[in-house]
């Protein structure tokens, strides 16, 4: 196996990085500050280049079930008259769709995928990164236990 990698943060970026690093052959552990991750946030758009990465990680079916494939972006006046529109995702000729979805739902899809791929014991919640030291050979991380 590759290196032992610590990912500090179980948000969208950290969980995506964990899946990519695991796929590249590294032993990954994710540390997340909150004790119980929940679906928080608002709607986001996943552009086709990011959807490609998530498809490559095997999340195509989960994304299609949790998101709406965006086919057009429109700007309208306050009385509903269209000012401008542009095709998006597959409708724009991209090989991958553009998705609109709740950011918290995306985080949960990624968290479930990380737990399946790495094992539930490789996602440690309630662990806040307090600091770290790095030298030429290694990094030592310090955590505050917030599981109470």
Region spans (language model):
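Conserved N-terminal helical subregion
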Residues: 1-5, 49-148
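Conserved N-terminal glycine-rich FAD pyrophosphate-binding loop of Rossmann-like flavoproteins
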Residues: 35-55
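Conserved S-adenosyl-L-methionine
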Residues: 9-11
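Glycine-rich FAD pyrophosphate-binding loop
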Residues: 22-42
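Conserved hydrophobic helix-helix packing surfaces used for dimerization/oligomerization
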Residues: 5-7, 28
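N-terminal Rossmann-fold NAD(P) dinucleotide-binding loop
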Residues: 14-15
């Amino acid at each position: 196996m590759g290196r032992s990698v610590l990912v500090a943060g179980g948000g969208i970026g950290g969980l995506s990085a964990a899946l990519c690093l695991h796929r590249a052959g590294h032993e990954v552990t994710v540390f997340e500050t909150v004790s119980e991750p929940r679906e928080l946030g608002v709607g986001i758009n996943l552009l086709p280049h990011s959807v490609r990465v998530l498809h490559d990680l095997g999340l195509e079916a989960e994304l299609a079930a949790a998101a709406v494939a965006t086919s057009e972006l429109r700007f309208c006046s306050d009385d509903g008259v269209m000012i401008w529109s542009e095709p998006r995702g597959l409708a724009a000729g991209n090989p991958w769709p553009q998705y609109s979805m709740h950011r918290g739902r995306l985080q949960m899809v990624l968290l479930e995928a990380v737990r399946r791929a790495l094992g539930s014991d490789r996602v440690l919640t309630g662990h806040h990164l307090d600091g770290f030291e790095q030298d030429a050979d290694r990094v030592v991380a310090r955590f505050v236990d917030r599981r109470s």
